């Protein structure tokens, strides 16, 4: 099973926020996920990012691949692979 760390869109139309989740790469963007490890709100100024570093590190060590946007968020938060 290929596991990805990616964003799951939440919120209203034109007012999105995102949850950072660990999911099977075959499931849909807003579908089934394994675990929630944080959130990202791009609407606030400055953008708000909260990541549970313990869970994120565990999943990265287990081989989960972050998407490009999540990789950028991890770098900004000081969490690198």
Curated annotation (Swiss-Prot):
The processes (GO biological process) annotated in the record are: translation
What UniProt keywords are attached to this protein's entry? Answer: Ribonucleoprotein, Ribosomal protein
Quote one Gene Ontology molecular function term. structural constituent of ribosome
One Pfam family this chain carries?
Ribosomal_S16
> What is the name of the protein in this document?
Small ribosomal subunit protein bS16
Q: Which family does it belong to?
A: Belongs to the bacterial ribosomal protein bS16 family.
- The gene it comes from is rpsP
GO terms under cellular component: cytoplasm; small ribosomal subunit
């Amino acid at each position: 099973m290929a596991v990805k760390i990616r964003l799951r869109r939440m919120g209203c139309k034109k007012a999105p926020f995102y949850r950072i989740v660990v999911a099977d790469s075959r499931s849909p963007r807003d579908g089934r996920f394994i675990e929630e490890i944080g959130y990202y709100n791009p609407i606030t100024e400055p953008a708000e990012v909260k990541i549970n570093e313990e869970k994120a590190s565990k999943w990265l060590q287990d081989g989960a691949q972050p998407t490009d946007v999540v990789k950028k968020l991890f770098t900004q938060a000081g969490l690198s692979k």
